[in-house]
């Protein structure tokens, strides 16, 4: 199951832009996100933001909405956040109706690709699966996943 929400002001206070530069911020307002639950991330939500312009393929690009005809709109996996506190979840949000309908139809596909995006990162960083350096950079160089190693169960050996 999923919900469409905004992230709360408390989230942005606890994850300030100067320390978490890859997390999306919009002056004075929050991003709309889809809350996904993923089996191996118990007690957490994976919040994937809707973007008007997504110039890469690390996510799901809408194909059938009016907005997607003018923009590269999509759900951006590279800017996801993982939250374990309910206080980080803000109010419900409404999104473009065409994108909502397309999301509903594609939800299983999006969910599977999101799980793979996270899984491949964790496996690479933990040393269980090695992605080519160029492939890793293309997928994860600007990713927010580096901020959520604790939630992902990643222990970086020093």
Indicate residue ranges for each PLM-predicted region.
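C-terminal terminal-subdomain/extension
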Residues: 66-158
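Residues that form or immediately flank small-molecule/cofactor binding pockets and catalytic motifs
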Residues: 9-10, 52, 85
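GIY-YIG nuclease catalytic motif and its immediate N-terminal context
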Residues: 1-27
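A broad, low-specificity signal marking well-ordered, structured residues that form hydrophobic/aromatic
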Residues: 2-5, 45, 75-81
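Compact nucleic-acid interaction/catalytic patches
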Residues: 26-28, 38-73
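Surface-exposed beta-strand edges and their flanking turn/coil or helix-capping segments
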Residues: 17-20, 58-63, 89-97
């Amino acid at each position: 199951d999923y919900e469409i929400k905004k992230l709360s002001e408390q989230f942005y206070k606890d994850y300030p832009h100067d320390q978490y530069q890859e997390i999306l911020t919009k002056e004075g307002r929050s991003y709309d996100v889809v809350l996904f639950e993923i089996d191996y991330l118990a007690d957490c939500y994976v919040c994937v933001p809707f973007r008007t312009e997504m110039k890469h393929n690390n996510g799901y690009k809408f194909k059938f909405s009016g907005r997607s005809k003018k923009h590269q709109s999509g759900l951006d996996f590279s800017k996801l956040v993982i939250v374990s506190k309910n206080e980080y979840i803000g109010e419900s949000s409404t999104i473009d109706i065409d994108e909502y309908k397309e999301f509903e139809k594609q939800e299983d596909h999006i969910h599977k690709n999101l799980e793979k995006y996270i899984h491949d990162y964790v496996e690479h960083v933990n040393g269980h699966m090695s992605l080519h350096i160029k492939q890793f950079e293309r997928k994860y160089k600007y990713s927010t996943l580096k901020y959520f190693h604790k939630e992902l169960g990643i222990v970086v050996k020093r």
